[in-house]
Amino acid sequence: QVMVSTVGIVPGIDRLAAENVPLTLAISLHAPDDDTRSAIVPTGRKFKVADILAAARRYQAAAGRPVNIEYTMLAGVNDSDAQARLLAQLLAADRMHVNLIPYNWIGPGVSGRVYQRPTDERMRRFAEILTAGGVVAHFRRTRGDDIEGACGQLRETVATGRQ
């Protein structure tokens, strides 16, 4: 089983659909709206959320496989009830699965902002809204954060020279 992950490069998604390679596509969306996404995803300004999801739908139609939407949850940034409702509206008619990923602290983000992980209760509430809206949502288990070895943390340690 092969999975290809992308930040949502629309021409690349369309190329995968045309090539009909049997794989699972994961799209790192992280926000249901363009303003929030462009603030937290460096390439977020290049492709609009609507265009990314349209490409994901084209991929699903061509491949006959659901697309995974990756959504790293950042406290006070992309974890509100309103954002959950908007994401549910955008995905309700699709078979896409949403993987909710708790943020692993790695230092300041691309904008210099320091992000925090939402509480477990906030994450549960977000998932409940998605589920009530007809969207399949799963929590991605995180491991290694107690030793700064979880997703993203090793890269930050190497990049900054921290030991």
Residue ranges and their predicted role:
Residues 136:
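C-terminal interaction modules of eukaryotic adaptor/scaffold proteins
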Residues 1-133:
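Conserved AdoMet/S-adenosylmethionine-binding subsite of the radical SAM
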Residues 132, 142-163:
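Radical SAM enzyme core and accessory elements
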